[in-house]
Amino acid sequence: MRLRNRIVHASMSTRYVKQREVTDKLITYHRTRAVGGAAMIVTEPLGMLPHQLMAFRPALFDQENLDGFKRWAEAVESEDCRLIGQMQDSGRGHRQPGRNATAIGPSALPDDLSWTVPH
């Protein structure tokens, strides 16, 4: 991948997502960074699985959200900027109630903070 410069906008949670859906405000935020000179933008964490039901995290698993992701990518790409998706799973970490109903991880050992055992 070739970039127009070395400016990369790091991932950060904007909370511009509504009920796990990409919004116009989120798209405008990232497009503005591309117009301002960013050659690559790393998205905020994207929910990969249905058990990651955080209203402020864009849901990759939801087919109804595909149009929003497409509009988001097209808006950034139209400014000669690359949008890199940061997929996230909380893994075995499970410190907050409701944060990760089913802990997932490669180890059968419990999380050292919450003692949640991953599956």
Label each residue range with its predicted role.
Residues 1-119:
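Flavin-dependent oxidoreductase catalytic cores
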